[in-house]
């Protein structure tokens, strides 16, 4: 792994941890009630952080290893982009016409062995079609920006690594 690629992955790890902490702070400090899609995006942020940590621990030595790392980090980020884009579409629909965004994560994972430990991360029953704003910008737009920055950064760093 070249120094540039390694620094980029460290940066993505730090930004991902901050984004995850920010999503928890928005819920538990600011009192925002996350919806199912918000929690899905939160899980994609967490998965991105975990993928960057794994790539940092594996320390790929060849360009092909860096390629694997870039793909590995990009998968949860691209998934997050698609979830956030779907939520933006839901929020663009006229009031009352948006479909349900699914069963709450707490319902889906109730029988899971680690549910008691993981429950604060997936708790939330907000309405997916009702936008919440941060600095005047809808939260799914922030999510798309974050995930897009992850994808662009990791592929830029991989392309520059020689």
UniProtKB/Swiss-Prot annotation:
Domain of life: Bacteria
Organism: Neisseria meningitidis serogroup B (strain ATCC BAA-335 / MC58)
Membrane topology label: Multi-pass membrane protein
Family assignment from sequence similarity: Belongs to the DsbB family.
InterPro entries associated with the record: DiS_bond_form_DsbB/BdbC, Disulphide_bond_form_DsbB, DsbB, DsbB-like_sf
Localisation: Cell inner membrane
CC per GO annotation: plasma membrane
Function text: Required for disulfide bond formation in some periplasmic proteins. Acts by oxidizing the DsbA protein.
Protein name (database record): Disulfide bond formation protein B
Ranges in the topological domain labelled Periplasmic: 26-43, 86-141
């Amino acid at each position: 792994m070249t120094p540039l690629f390694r620094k980029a992955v460290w940066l993505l790890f730090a930004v991902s941890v901050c984004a995850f902490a920010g999503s928890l702070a928005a819920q538990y400090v600011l009192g925002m009630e996350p919806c199912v899609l918000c929690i899905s995006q939160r899980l994609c942020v967490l998965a991105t952080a975990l993928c960057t940590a794994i790539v940092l621990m594996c320390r790929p030595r060849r360009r092909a290893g860096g390629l694997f790392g870039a793909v590995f980090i990009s998968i949860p980020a691209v998934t997050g982009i698609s979830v956030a884009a779907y939520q933006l579409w839901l929020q663009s629909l006229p009031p009352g016409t948006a479909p349900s965004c699914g069963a709450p994560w707490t319902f889906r994972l109730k029988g899971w062995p680690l549910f008691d430990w993981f429950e604060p991360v997936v708790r939330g029953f907000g309405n997916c079609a009702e936008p919440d704003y941060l600095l005047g910008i809808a939260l799914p737009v922030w999510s798309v920006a974050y995930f897009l920055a992850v994808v662009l950064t990791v592929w830029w760093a991989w392309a520059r690594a020689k």
